């Protein structure tokens, strides 16, 4: 406290078990962020904020501490390369955001490297321009043959769950 008002960084655990931090300046809440942990104590996500907005790289972790994903934000907006992993640097998907919209190639991979076929372990390649789907290809795991993407993903295609078109 300073002059009877909350001041500087305050840390506490909330009712959900998240570790919260609040930055106060002479009684005015300036910024807040939180950390979520697995039951084993391992950090789930390492957020980064600036002026109360998501900003910078966010790292996500598996319960054993391995990185499960990397996200990037600029002033609360999704930007840059986003990557999720299965395990030990084995990529599940990767793609780019530009001004909160998917932009350029997004690639989803089958688990376990070494799948046969020209496309290796690529499950699908989707090309976006400013958030709009331009083209899409899906591949069979066995021989890399191009197939209808519905055969892999079905009607509830999670690859487009965040689209705001």
Q: What positions do the PLM features span?
A:
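Glycine/tyrosine- and acidic-biased, solvent-exposed loop/turn segments at the edges of beta-strands
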Residues: 1-165
């Amino acid at each position: 406290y300073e002059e009877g008002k909350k001041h500087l960084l305050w840390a506490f655990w909330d009712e959900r078990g998240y570790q919260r931090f609040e930055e106060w300046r002479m009684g005015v809440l300036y910024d807040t962020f939180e950390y979520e942990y697995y039951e084993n104590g391992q950090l789930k996500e390492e957020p980064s904020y600036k002026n109360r907005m998501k900003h910078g790289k966010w790292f996500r972790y598996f319960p054993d501490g391995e990185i499960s994903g990397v996200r990037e934000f600029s002033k609360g907006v999704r930007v840059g390369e986003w990557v999720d992993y299965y395990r030990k640097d084995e990529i599940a998907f990767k793609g780019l955001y530009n001004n909160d919209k998917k932009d350029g190639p997004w690639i989803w991979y089958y688990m376990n490297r070494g799948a046969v076929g020209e496309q290796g372990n690529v499950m699908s390649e989707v090309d976006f321009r400013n958030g709009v789907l331009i083209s899409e290809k899906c591949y069979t795991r066995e021989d890399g043959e191009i197939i209808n993407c519905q055969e892999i993903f079905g009607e509830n295609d999670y690859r487009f769950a965040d689209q705001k078109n």
